[in-house]
Amino acid sequence: MENVNFTPKEILQKQFRQKMRGYDPDDVDSFLDNVIKDYDAFVKENQRLQDENERLLAKVDELTRQVQVGASQPRAAATSPASSNVTNMDILKRLSNLERHVFGSQLDNDPNESHRL
């Protein structure tokens, strides 16, 4: 808080000179008590927000590093889909053979009914 003129303690300890037709000291003290409470609340809120900002910046840095590390590592996942594609191809071939076996025998039994498939 670089642009702050007073600390809560300075506001609390401020003494005003009394003049003949001056302000009521009790009124001034009461008002300053309220000002100090507000000021103190603003200082705490400002500190909380600064702490949260630092925490979030640190998290952004951490996530950025994780992304950079992930981008620089060889893609193990890129080889994995290839093996799953082979597996998928095997499954598709088996399914095709099974369909030919099941539906092929039906087609052989009734050649006029083949259009229903």
From Swiss-Prot:
GO annotations of cellular component type: cytoplasm
Plastid among keywords: no
Sorted UniProt keywords: Cell cycle, Cell division, Cell shape, Coiled coil, Cytoplasm
UniProt keyword annotation of Cell cycle present: yes
Leader sequence residues: none
Cellular compartments annotated: Cytoplasm
Pfam entry (one): DivIVA
Bilayer-crossing regions: none
Coiled coil: 32-70
Database matches in InterPro entries: Cell_cycle_GpsB, DivIVA_domain, DivIVA_fam
GO BP, sorted A to Z: cell division; regulation of cell shape
Function noted in UniProt: Divisome component that associates with the complex late in its assembly, after the Z-ring is formed, and is dependent on DivIC and PBP2B for its recruitment to the divisome. Together with EzrA, is a key component of the system that regulates PBP1 localization during cell cycle progression. Its main role could be the removal of PBP1 from the cell pole after pole maturation is completed. Also contributes to the recruitment of PBP1 to the division complex. Not essential for septum formation.
NCBIfam families: DivI1A_domain, PRK14127.1
Family membership: Belongs to the GpsB family.
Binding partners and assembly: Forms polymers through the coiled coil domains. Interacts with PBP1, MreC and EzrA.
Protein's UniProt name: Cell cycle protein GpsB
Origin species: Levilactobacillus brevis (strain ATCC 367 / BCRC 12310 / CIP 105137 / JCM 1170 / LMG 11437 / NCIMB 947 / NCTC 947)
